[in-house]
Amino acid sequence: MGGTFHEQVLPPWHRVVLKIGSSLLTGEHGRLSDAHARRLARFVIASRAAGREVVLVSSGAITAGRVVMTTGGLVAGHGRGHHFAHRQALAALGQTRMIALWQGLFDRPLAQVLLTHDDLRNRRRYLNARATIEELLRYGIVPVINENDSVAVDELTFGDNDNLAAFVAGLIGADLLLVATDVAGLYSADPHADARAQPVDAVRALTPAVLAMATGTASTFGTGGMRSKLEAAQKAAAAGIDTILFNGRDPEVAELLIRGKLRGTRVYSPYSRRHARTHWLLHAPASPGGIRIDAGAARALRNGGASLLPTGVTGVAGAFQRGDVVEIAAVDEPLPIARGITQYGASELRLICGCHSGAIRDRLGYTYGSAVVHRNDLVTLPAAMRGIAAGVQVHA
């Protein structure tokens, strides 16, 4: 094996997702160990002190559950067990041990967030998951996220926490995905089998040739190998997010991260985050309904990059749910001028249209926020697309 990974400067960031694999939380005899996690926790603490946000995606629950079952002398009773159910039982048994390991490394409360694939497929649950994580970050709490293995359906799992981390990065609009593993990064070939294998510092495009460099073998305690990590990086790249794969066992990793540097493989996204989001909003199917807004709100959307507030809404057409993509038309204009993800369903919006944001709770008894459509979830339509995008005429 020739060469070493070069030290790289991290791109500017405010929010990152840091994924830690089972192998970094496992010591002798397969028991949980905080030896490597302690260094990564120092980076999280230093980031919080600097006003930055780190969301942890941590494996280790199944590994911890296996240890508890073995050392506790737990023996199954009569009847035939099921492999997937056994895995779920291990996750349930080990989840508290895994979160306790992390809590012992911080002087402030952590929050455990368990997600299933269905949480991100269902738009309302997707928005609720995002809102929960955003609220935790607003209070300075570090979310520790894992797949809810205990209730996940076999055919609807993320497969491994590499993929979960990529989904979470897209969910919360992370600036960067950091994947801590037990190898230094991607090599041109298997470094254990080929002495000519060279470290790959940068991947500009995840071509079949690049994917072929990765072996699919997982570590003893994990489920995702290098192939899985590149597939996760591919998902993050589609959302405009770069991924860096690095060695979490490196004794200098905390100091490097705190100084804004790393040694490893950086997988570049061909898109900016804004470009990826805009492209999706422009081409996602819109619901059979829409929102009519006044001239002032139309000017604010077109010129100021503002959120759409209920005070600017004059009417609602059709039926749509919270989390749907809806088209937005200005008064006296037949075609939509914008589209975005609505925070309120049509029936809710009819009750709050025209009111100030502070009155939403009074009218509904609850609130999903001050905006009907947040500016991060909204795109104005280029003139050439307005006729194409219009799925319905918004009359109200």
Identify the residue ranges that each predicted region occupies:
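C-terminal catalytic "cap/lid" subdomain
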Residues: G2-A396
